[in-house]
């Protein structure tokens, strides 16, 4: 067998080249990895698995049409390769083709680290985008290990629908969840958030109050209810609720920022500044906090501090706009 050592050397070289390409991908050098893999494919046309490697590189580069081209070849060559099938499905989804993604993602429901996302979640989103809401609910129920007809399944699906801006269906599903189990924690909070987002303030207030009846230790509900009250100029109620939210959770900046806004509206500028300074310490790069601080200082007649904060807010805003 005179060719055996040469074959072994060729395999070793191929393995080393693949390891090098993987390292380049980990470093984010996708074009270099793709170039090396294409050279490898040209010099080793008989080598298996290179279409999957190239498809993966294009997937990680977010070049989904090219990823689809190579992953289709990889799937055709080995129909039982779950990774190739799942990556092809994800590439279709991320390339804006959810209907093509669904049968592939249905076929492979496991987790593959190469994809770096939960394919079960993506499958649920594909169902939403193709308006197949019952199957979306079944997918999310499976993801969260709850029965598909449970209140929790309806609530999880409502949350995902809201995230995808399918607001009317989200409202319908959240209401269904509340009807199935009116005491399900966070279902009234979700409805309140939805109504607040739609500026349906009285309905939002009613839902947040229901949530507090069954879930009185939830800091976010006090915060969101305070937000609703502040929108109808009920600043005393808003301040009282914000204080409760902060007592329950002093790690969130939102309640401190809203407290600053509420106190400024009440004319309590020094207390407003104190709340906003606390928020700025926790998150120095939030332009809203610095803008509100600038306004509060201006109301107090502190011109230099006001200009400094407003200038900083503008700088942070422009930085965020240039790096979305």
State the predicted function of each range.
Residues 14, 48-49, 82-83, 115-118, ...:
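Helix-start (N-cap) detector for alpha-helical repeat units in TPR-like alpha-solenoids
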Residues 13-47, 56, 60, 125, ...:
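Alpha-helical segment of the N-proximal tetratricopeptide repeat
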Residues 3-6, 288-324:
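Terminal, low-structured helical/coil segments at or just beyond the last alpha-helical repeat
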């Amino acid at each position: 067998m005179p060719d055996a050592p040469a074959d072994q050397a060729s395999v070793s070289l191929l393995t080393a080249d693949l390891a090098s390409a993987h390292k380049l991908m980990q470093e984010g050098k996708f074009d270099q990895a793709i170039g090396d893999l294409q050279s490898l494919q040209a010099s080793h046309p008989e080598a298996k698995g290179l279409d999957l490697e190239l498809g993966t590189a294009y997937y990680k580069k977010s070049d989904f049409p090219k990823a689809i081209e190579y992953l289709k070849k990889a799937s055709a060559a080995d129909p039982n390769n779950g990774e190739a099938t799942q990556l092809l499905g994800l590439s279709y989804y991320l390339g804006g083709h959810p209907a093509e993604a669904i049968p592939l993602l249905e076929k492979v429901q496991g987790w593959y680290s190469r994809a770096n996302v939960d394919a079960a979640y993506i499958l649920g989103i594909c169902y939403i985008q193709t308006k197949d809401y019952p199957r979306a609910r079944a997918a999310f129920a499976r993801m969260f290990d709850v029965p598909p007809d449970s209140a929790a399944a309806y609530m999880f699906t409502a949350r995902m629908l809201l995230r995808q801006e399918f607001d009317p269906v989200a409202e319908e599903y959240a209401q269904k969840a509340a009807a199935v189990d009116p005491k399900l924690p966070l279902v009234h909070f979700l409805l309140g958030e939805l109504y607040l987002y739609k500026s349906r303030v009285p309905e939002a207030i009613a839902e947040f109050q229901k949530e507090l009846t069954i879930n009185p230790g939830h800091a976010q509900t006090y915060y969101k209810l305070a937000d609703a009250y502040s929108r109808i100029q009920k600043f005393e109620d808003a301040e009282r609720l914000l204080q409760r939210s902060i007592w329950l959770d002093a790690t969130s900046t939102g309640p401190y920022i809203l407290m600053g806004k509420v106190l400024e509206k009440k004319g309590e500028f020094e207390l407003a500044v104190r709340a906003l300074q606390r928020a700025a310490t926790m998150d120095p790069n939030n332009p809203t906090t610095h803008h509100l601080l600038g306004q509060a200082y201006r109301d107090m007649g502190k011109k230099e501090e006001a200009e400094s904060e407003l200038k900083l807010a503008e700088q942070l805003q422009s930085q965020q706009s240039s790096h979305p």
